[in-house]
Amino acid sequence: MKKKHRIKKNDEFQTVFQKGKSTANRQFVVYQLDKEEQPNFRIGLSVSKKIGNAVVRNRIKRMIRQSITELKDEIDSGKDFVIIARKPCAEMTYEEVKKSLIHVFKRSGMKRIKK
């Protein structure tokens, strides 16, 4: 994911948590906040230490980032997203992670996701 698509600062995460709406499935929670003045989407990732050690957490983040990279043309611009991984995603394959992200994005009301 390019820098323009990342949320890094704590106050930006907090804004999305407090003002955004959340959607969830068994593997992920997605907070979504509309930002009309923003030309593209931004995504922040959160993987708790409860999920596993650093190797497991980094693997999950890499799979999420790769899924987002493949879906970037279908994700609505002008929005901030925070994706929180839940414990079941520690044992998932890349295809399952991508499918689960598509599912939770569709539940959040994104019309452009087709896959």
UniProtKB/Swiss-Prot annotation:
InterPro entries: Ribosomal_Su5_D2-typ_SF, Ribsml_uS5_D2-typ_fold_subgr, RNase_P, RNase_P_CS. Keywords: Endonuclease, Hydrolase, Nuclease, RNA-binding, tRNA processing. It is an enzyme of class 3 (hydrolase). GO terms for molecular function: 3'-tRNA processing endoribonuclease activity; ribonuclease P activity; tRNA binding. GO terms for cellular component: ribonuclease P complex. It catalyses: Endonucleolytic cleavage of RNA, removing 5'-extranucleotides from tRNA precursor. Transmembrane segments: none annotated. It comes from the Bacteria. Its EC number is 3.1.26.5. GO terms for biological process: tRNA 5'-leader removal. The keyword Phosphoprotein does not apply. Consists of a catalytic RNA component (M1 or rnpB) and a protein subunit. Belongs to the RnpA family. RNaseP catalyzes the removal of the 5'-leader sequence from pre-tRNA to produce the mature 5'-terminus. It can also cleave other RNA substrates such as 4.5S RNA. The protein component plays an auxiliary but essential role in vivo by binding to the 5'-leader sequence and broadening the substrate specificity of the ribozyme. PANTHER family: RIBONUCLEASE P PROTEIN COMPONENT (PTHR33992:SF1). This is Ribonuclease P protein component. The gene is rnpA.
